[in-house]
Amino acid sequence: MRKLLVLLLFLPLMATAKIPVEEDIIRQTLDSESPYYYPNLMLRYQSGDDSMTEEDYHYLYYGYAYQDAYKPLNANSDMDKAILIAQTVDFENPTHESLEKLIAAVNDALVQDPFSPKLLNLLAFAYGALGDSKNEQINYNRMNSILATIEDSGNGLKEG
């Protein structure tokens, strides 16, 4: 009885998982006629398009693995630099100069890792601290959309 109750409680969570289907992602992101054609999705993402849907983010995030720019085994020295700069920022009272330096370093790191929640969070913070609410919101939305895409694929322990 107890196992049945636990199963019934987790059933809605399992039903909502959006498992990435490799063949579909490849087909959709490589087809220039598809609404999920990768170059177009990436342009929308980079421009801060706030009309991107969960489905757009699904194909954007998982389609990145099939792009020439995807090099998961390469070290991202720009990420290391951005983290080092972030460690020098006084988050209670940041200077304009330190925030501009952080933004530049994070943008460099995002070239190699465009969906890093850590980098997007730093960027949202820096823009917010500078009073640039537009870019703060763009990067906050990007971060949350990427995290939601990852979460939608399952619980991290198994698919679905």
Per-range role (PLM):
Residues 108-109, 143:
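Canonical positions in the second alpha-helix
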Residues 117-118, 145-159:
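Boundary/linker segments of alpha-helical solenoid repeat arrays
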Residues 118-119, 126:
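The tetratricopeptide repeat
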Residues 18-99, 150, 160:
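N-terminal alpha-helical interaction modules that lie
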Residues 3-13:
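Sec-dependent N-terminal signal peptides
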Residues 128-151:
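TPR/TPR-like (Sel1-like) alpha-helical repeat modules
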